[in-house]
From Swiss-Prot:
Keyword Nucleotide-binding: no
Regions that span the bilayer: 20-40
Disulfide bonds: C161-C185, C175-C236, C227-C240, C333-C454, C365-C375, C448-C458, C528-C539
Classification via InterPro entries: Hemagglutn-neuramid, Hemagglutn/HN, Sialidase_sf
Positions annotated with a glycan in the UniProt record: N110, N139, N267, N504
UniProt name for this protein: Hemagglutinin-neuraminidase
EC number: 3.2.1.18
Keywords: Disulfide bond, Glycoprotein, Hemagglutinin, Host cell membrane, Host membrane, Host-virus interaction, Hydrolase, Membrane, Signal-anchor, Transmembrane, Transmembrane helix, Viral attachment to host cell, Viral envelope protein, Virion, Virus entry into host cell
Localization per Swiss-Prot or TrEMBL: Virion membrane; Host cell membrane
Oligomer status and interactors: Homotetramer; composed of disulfide-linked homodimers. Interacts with F protein trimer.
Enzyme kind, highest EC tier: hydrolase
């Protein structure tokens, strides 16, 4: 698939839905017109011929209206329910057919193996979904670790370091990237970037394995940092920024660092562009990828972002006096309401980072090769999210969700449902609805440890995203009972004791610590999927683990089955 063909499906859906809406509006107008004429006719008949004739005329008009409404209802059902389901089924059928038609590995001698970039049929329909009902979510447990071949390369010297993983999975394939530092773990001087793509296949033991089909090693002297990756049709898109100074210095800068988009296709086409999104220069002192993965949505690739906003700019002023306090805080914080509000308002501004406002948002880029000025920056409203931080975007069916790292004072897992508004075919605004939870805490320093429950200024924590196993919208009150899984560092203040868990809003349901007590670790990424053949749900937990042999950190993928007990 070439880059120009990528948005075709989304465009066709938009055209179909637009045409359907216009047709329905026409039917509605005709119905109103007929009803209006019928009322006039009824009055004329009653004044001239009495009630007997009017009843007959009115009955025929009522029958006509019923017929029109019946047709309209059928059109609404077909366009809103039946056709989307048929399109989804057709897509899955085509993917399955492509997979079965891929070149066989039993080829003539000296010919290459022509694997298609499509996951095994068992997984195509089991990706990016909610896998359990609310009731089932109360009875989930973690299975044992499964022994898979790692698709993530590691350092090969004691001085090397691999850090900041980003992983994205769709129906067709997966994409992965991490930073490679040759000496130490500081990435602001010199580093390289590893990128790979591949597919999920079953092993002879029945559980899944991740097969790498393409790799790219960016070692060209450009210090790309904090890269986020997203699967796109036919390949991967990666968003990075370029800097050779410490993070704090980025926030003190007058202009944001260089922003780059890299597109890598399965056919070995590689495109890299320096992008200049409008509204960034003179507004953002620094703009950073969220490191967690992005998503492909309606022809646009969306990436999580955060950074420092310059004082007295339009964005700064639009966020004045806005603050967000998670729902669970009211019952857990001993501060009075006025103190909570004041502390929450001030938590977005950091003297350590040059008195910038620390802001989260989304970078939206159309899937095309000329991206210099086409990407858009969409900030979240700060009365809906906490202080800006690293993050990740997810697709569950047709819904977009967002994870925000708990850098700020609230130490619990922060997940949001995102609504994206489109204007003239472009994303123009975003809003976020928090999934309320008082689990699972991250470690932090000082007054910002895992035990903190009250608003205040914090700049701490660690990236530890989570995967929703149940749909927060399935309850009458959004998110009142949601179950999710991930990995966290089970301590109040230190980055130690990596633990995989299943939790709901109020408690950890099941957990398994990896390694001995005191094992050092850092970032954690979690993605789940279903084997539709066996109906089993698997989760991959990608965790940065410290190593005493090779490098300060190694990135390790762990696979577990989530079982319904």
């Amino acid at each position: 698939m070439v880059a120009e063909d990528a948005p075709v499906r989304g465009t066709c859906r938009v055209l179909f839905r637009t045409t359907t809406l216009l047709f329905l509006c026409t039917l509605l107008s005709l119905s109103i017109s007929i009803l209006y004429e019928s009322l006039i006719t009824q009055n004329q008949i009653m004044s001239q011929a009495g009630s007997t004739g009017s009843n007959s005329g009115l009955g025929s008009i009522t029958d006509l209206l019923n017929n029109i409404l019946s047709v309209a209802n059928q059109i609404i059902y077909n366009s809103a329910v039946a056709l989307p389901l048929q399109l989804d089924t057709l897509e899955s059928t085509l993917l399955t057919a492509f997979k079965s038609l891929q070149t066989s590995d039993k080829l003539e001698q000296n010919c290459s193996w022509g694997a298609a970039l499509i996951n095994d049929n068992r997984y195509i329909n089991g990706i990016n979904q909610f896998y359990f009902s609310i009731a089932e979510g109360r009875n989930l447990t973690l299975g044992p670790l499964l022994n898979i071949l790692s698709f993530i390369p590691t350092a090969t010297t004691p001085e090397g370091c691999t850090r900041i993983p980003s992983f994205s999975l769709t129906k067709t394939h997966w994409c992965y990237t991490h930073n490679v530092i040759l000496n130490g773990c500081q990435d602001h001087v010199s580093s390289n970037q590893f990128v790979s793509m591949g597919i999920i296949e079953p092993t002879s033991a029945g559980f899944p394995s991740f097969r790498t089909l393409k790799t790219l090693y960016l070692s060209d002297g450009v210090n790309r940092k904090s890269c986020s990756i997203s699967t796109v049709p036919g390949g991967c898109m990666m968003y990075c920024f370029v800097s050779t100074q410490p993070e704090r210095d980025d926030y003190f800068s007058a202009a944001p660092p260089e922003q780059r988009i890299i597109i890598m296709y399965y056919n070995d086409t590689i495109v890299e562009r320096i992008i200049n999104p409008p509204g960034v220069l003179d507004v953002w002192a620094t703009l950073n990828p969220g490191t967690g993965s992005g998503v492909y949505y309606l022809g646009w690739v969306l990436f999580p972002i955060y950074g420092g906003v310059i004082k007295d700019t339009s964005l700064w002023n639009s966020q004045a006096n806005k603050y967000f306090i998670p729902q669970m805080v009211a019952a857990l914080c001993s501060q009075n309401q006025a103190t909570q509000v004041q502390n929450a308002k001030s938590s977005y501004y950091s003297s350590w980072f040059g008195n910038r406002m620390i802001q989260s948002g989304i970078l939206a880029c159309p899937l095309q090769q000329d991206l210099t000025n086409e990407c858009l920056v969409l900030p979240f409203s700060n009365d809906q999210v906490l202080m800006g931080a690293e993050g990740r975007l997810y697709m569950y069916g047709d819904s977009v969700y967002y994870y925000q790292r708990s850098n700020s004072w609230w130490p619990m897992t922060m997940l949001y449902k995102v609504t994206i508004t489109f204007t003239n075919g472009q994303p123009s605004a975003i809003s976020a609805q928090n999934v309320p939870t008082q689990q699972v805490p991250r470690p932090g320093t000082g007054d910002c440890s895992a035990t903190n429950r009250c608003p205040g200024f914090c700049l701490t924590g660690v990236y530890a995203d989570a995967w929703l196993l149940t749909n927060p919208s399935s309850t009458s009150t959004f998110g009142s009972e949601a179950t999710f899984t991930g990995s966290y560092l089970n301590t109040a203040t230190q980055r130690i004791n990596p633990t995989m868990y299943i939790a709901n809003n109020t408690q950890i349901i099941s957990s398994q610590q990896f390694g001995s007590s005191g094992q050092e670790a850092a970032y954690g990424h979690t993605t789940c999927f279903r084997d539709t053949g066996s109906v089993m749900v698997y989760c991959i937990y990608i965790i940065e683990l410290s190593s005493s042999l090779l490098g300060q950190f190694q990135i390790v993928p762990f696979i577990r089955q989530v079982t319904l007990s």
